[in-house]
Amino acid sequence: SGSCQLKTCWQVTPDFRTVGTLLKHKFYNATLIKAHNRNTGQVEHAHHHPHRRKSSAGELVFFEESPNFCESEPKLDSAGTRGRICNKTSPGLDNCESLCCGRGHNILRQTRQERCNCKF
């Protein structure tokens, strides 16, 4: 009787944190490029650096800067974040450090009386 060997290869997606960390690193190291208008498919780095190599296949590149969502931009229908209410203790996107874009914030303390319809 003969022996039989079976090999199976498969790819497994890394855990979510690993993927997120990799994407964040690629995002912060992305390169601004500009396309030539010659239908050649060629692109060049917008900030010409003689020592800069060509972009690699796994590198993130972008054609235009992202808008500054902190400031009002009527053309983009963006009201900005000035005057928005933030949550000083929140770890989320509504926290004051993130939402106020480093401009600082005012603290508003309120005391309210509300009917609670309590039953004793």
From Swiss-Prot:
A Pfam cross-reference name: wnt
Chief site of localization: secreted
Lipid-modified residues, O-palmitoleoyl serine kind: S1
InterPro entries noted in UniProt: Wnt, Wnt_C
Keyword Secreted (UniProt): yes
UniProt KW Thylakoid keyword: no
Molecular function as annotated in GO: cytokine activity; frizzled binding
PANTHER family, sorted: PROTEIN WNT-10A, WNT RELATED
UniProt-recorded name of the protein: Protein Wnt-10a
Biological source species: Alopias vulpinus
Gene from which the chain derives: WNT-10A
